[in-house]
Amino acid sequence: MGPSCPVFLSFTKLSLWWLLLTPAGGEEAKRPPPRAPGDPLSSPSPTALPQGGSHTETEDRLFKHLFRGYNRWARPVPNTSDVVIVRFGLSIAQLIDVDEKNQMMTTNVWLKQEWSDYKLRWNPADFGNITSLRVPSEMIWIPDIVLYNNADGEFAVTHMTKAHLFSTGTVHWVPPAIYKSSCSIDVTFFPFDQQNCKMKFGSWTYDKAKIDLEQMEQTVDLKDYWESGEWAIVNATGTYNSKKYDCCAEIYPDVTYAFIIRRLPLFYTINLIIPCLLISCLTVLVFYLPSNCGEKITLCISVLLSLTVFLLLITEIIPSTSLVIPLIGEYLLFTMIFVTLSIVITVFVLNVHHRSPSTHTMPHWVRGTLLGCVPRWLLMNRPPPPLELCHPLHLKLSPSYHWLESNVDAEEREVVVEEEDRWACAGHVAPSVGTLCSHGHLHSGASGPKAEALLQEGELLLSPHMQKALEGVHYIADHLRSEDADSSVKEDWKYVAMVIDRIFLWLFIIVCFLGTIGLFLPPFLAGMI
């Protein structure tokens, strides 16, 4: 008989199994002869078993009895048309990570599987009342349940733990596994987001006519779940599905578990949201700083630089995806535009603040709106001008006769009186003497009836020195009036700058408030806060 003969090969395999399973000693003579591969399984006669054997020997005999001629590659059904019903359940031990960038969820789970194998039945009374036995899973038939939406790593179970056999033929197998499943991450409401990640389990090669799945429980077992510091499992339910794929004509069953997980936002609130709100508040305070303060533009630039550095630091925190813009990303972009606009507006306000009549002319609409109605709407009350500015300068410097009389030099006054008397006798006015009326008008060289009329009206005749002095006084008065007018216009420009600052102060407060509400309101309405 050649080595290629099937009978010889079968005999060789049985001999090897017998040598491996037979303990040392002379037990071979007490064992029943090996069965042929085609013989049906039958329990040995109780009379052939030693009655006083130990539990270890009994378990050893049971092991040999079960796997004598057992084929682990064939489905455990009496007829090929029968269906193996696999009861499937899932228990999660830990939610390890949710990778937003690579769109996958890493979990540590236990796959609970249970089916019936008619070839692994025995009568407990024949084997010392042993009702269950634990055997290596590599020695029995196991369903090829895999994770359909696997993203990285092994699709099937890699750690082949032992299976638990029962005398009724029921096989219970709970292997642990670490899976990286694909998950469509939606970071629209980050960091107040809620994700729906699914895990789809099913047989890879057997269709529904060969293996059918049945759920042990409708929900995922969370009894042994270790709480995550970043995510909380809101709900985890399983559904049974049957689907026909394009590759095959058969229908394949699967059990899909949907994990509703919610991100815990405390870390991002402390390290992301609150700093953004504080930077926005600093931007608002820029418009409350007086324009004559030299640190106004410095504060704007400092806020912008701090925001830029802050954005560089949090690039690793924000999910790096281009599918959608996270809500916090929109808020950061809004804050950046907010600060940039504040710098532009501050430069414009400083330009308005330092305007003068020599460089700019204030338009009438600016004077009517920004100096008239707008301050009243903003509840701004401009203080009235000082009291001395309300009276013209020439009223205080009125060159009346009595005023001049009290200030003219006594010697000069005597000379003037002598000249008046001397020329009055002749009926003339002194030619070298001018006159000053009580209204401040200077007349020089008046004579004849006109001079007499002027004297009757109370005019004072002045010398050339007094004439020059009064001209100087008038020049100074005109110059002071011009300076007062220029100063008034400058103050108007400064007040216009203050009004513009106040307008943007309220505008930025409203925009900052609405932006903050826009950050928290959508996830609040969606029930994520």
From Swiss-Prot:
Extracellular side of membrane: 27-264
Disulfide bond positions: C183-C197, C247-C248
One MF annotation (Gene Ontology) recorded for this entry: acetylcholine receptor activity
Swiss-Prot/TrEMBL GO biological process terms: acetylcholine receptor signaling pathway; membrane depolarization; monoatomic ion transmembrane transport; neuromuscular synaptic transmission; response to nicotine; synaptic transmission, cholinergic
Keyword Thylakoid: no
Family (UniProt): Belongs to the ligand-gated ion channel (TC 1.A.9) family. Acetylcholine receptor (TC 1.A.9.1) subfamily. Alpha-2/CHRNA2 sub-subfamily.
Protein name stated in the entry: Neuronal acetylcholine receptor subunit alpha-2
Organism: Pan troglodytes (Chimpanzee)
